[in-house]
Amino acid sequence: MIRKLHLGLACLLLSGGFALGQKLTADLPYVEGGHERQVLDVYVPESTKGRNLPVMFWIHGGGWQQGDKSDVHVKPKVLCDRGFVFVSTNYRLLPEVTMEEIVGDVAKSLAWVHREIAKYGGDPNRIFVGGHSAGAQLAALICTDDRYLKKEGVSLEVLKGCVPVDGDTYDIPKIIMTAEHRQAVYGGKMPTNGHRQKFGNDPKKHLHFSAVTHVAPGKKIPPFLILYFPGNPETRAQAHRLRTVLQAANIPAKAYGKADSNHGRLNHDLGKPDDPATKELFAFLDSLIEN
């Protein structure tokens, strides 16, 4: 069932503390007759009567095995304040479905947004994609491997920016090699629920699900802002790896590390006015909207 909620006095205006409202339409199915997790939420600024607002499409984390579209913290509030429509999607999870099907769900959800978001005041041709942790991998992949969206009849041209947050799987072969090298050097048990368990043992699939594999000039890949916690060597290395590959293909990309944080707090604090990563995010979005 689709739920409609009016969140009066829900958004704090960053410039002065005046509260704005937002309208949430929850649990919209993006696959007709689909799985209970093939649903998304749409947040719209209640006080804004304008149309063609830019859209932020958010993908939750949780190791591809858990998590929920409600894990957005203050992001919908502050982005509604800034004149965005905010969409948060669910997707089916491991081990019930394969990784290929998870990415396919994200593509189907994005295609729904492209088709339907104008009804909610959003611009179907100005969509930004972001996600945290596992959602960062999915965001980066969907913005670089155009096959998923092409299958749904959508071009990468409608994506105007990508904001992956603290992902460690933009280059899956490297993260697997890192974990196995560490185990060989320092000993201890290999993880029973690590990347090999999630992505399988086929090296071709490791490449297939790695965003860096698909980066190339001329594909209409959008600019990237890659946020990460520098205290984690894996996410730091992966952020810089993705940035380097993007820049080599002449795609605008910046990697920003927020030191006073951790994996969870980086996501939780994103959107707070005094947060350094938030300032980077707003500068990134503003520069692309103005262009």
Regions from the PLM with identified roles:
Residues 1-5:
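Positively charged n-region of N-terminal signal peptides that target proteins for export
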Residues 6-17:
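Bacterial N-terminal signal peptides
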Residues 20-291:
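Alpha/beta-hydrolase superfamily serine-hydrolase fold, recognizing
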